[in-house]
Amino acid sequence: MKLHELKPAQGSRKTRNRVGRGSSSGNGKTAGRGQKGQKARSGGNIRSGFEGGQTPLFRRLPKRGFTNINAKEYALVNLDQLNVFEDGAEVTPVVLVETGIVKAEKSGIKILGNGELTKKLTVKAAKFSKSAEAAIIAKGGSIEVI
């Protein structure tokens, strides 16, 4: 047997059903689209949420809220994530991005107090939660708001 003689196993492949190719095929004339109407036409489809002309739900409900264009989004780092650094190390936003703890700086870094810190560190970030601040200082480390 050679490569060009290989064939799939009998019955493992089903031939594609070609519609609209004569009435004797069983799928000629209307090609499985029924009779006339929007869905029988080319490009004829109804958008999602269409309710047959009735005012759709998304238009019956009131608009609500807005997006504040001045909102700052901080990259969040928990205390237990800082344990990867050596004792006495200086942790800056640049170092956090390089080590892969944070993907991007965004509007700055905020240190949160989740988890337990086991090392003395000097942490520089834009914001600190009160619990994170207390935990870093309790371990003999220092914080610096940048």
Swiss-Prot record:
Keywords from the named record: Ribonucleoprotein, Ribosomal protein, RNA-binding, rRNA-binding
Keyword tRNA-binding: no
Biased composition (Gly residues): 23-35
Gene3D superfamilies the record matches: 3.100.10.10
Organism: Streptococcus mutans serotype c (strain ATCC 700610 / UA159)
Start and end residues of each stretch annotated as Disordered: 1-57
Any Pfam family matching the protein: Ribosomal_L27A
rRNA-binding as UniProt keyword: yes
Family: Belongs to the universal ribosomal protein uL15 family.
GO biological process terms held by the UniProt record: translation
Biological role: Binds to the 23S rRNA.
GO MF annotation list: rRNA binding; structural constituent of ribosome
GO CC annotation, single: cytosolic large ribosomal subunit
Self-association and partners: Part of the 50S ribosomal subunit.
Name of the protein in its database record: Large ribosomal subunit protein uL15
Family matches, as HAMAP family: Ribosomal_uL15
